[in-house]
Amino acid sequence: MDSRIYTIFNSYPDLVSSYQSGSTASLGLLVGHYIKQFGFTDDPVKVSRRMKELI
């Protein structure tokens, strides 16, 4: 899952930086891009939680 998350982070660096600046909505968009690219192979809640840990 982590490698997929990093793929999304690298594809949307602007969303990562806006999340780091306090925009919590950006995390939802990152999860949305993850689902769009990889489908529901992983639980979106787990993906979201893991993204928070990695950012």
Positions of predicted regions on the chain:
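Charged, compositionally biased, marginally structured helical/coil segments
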Residues: 1-55
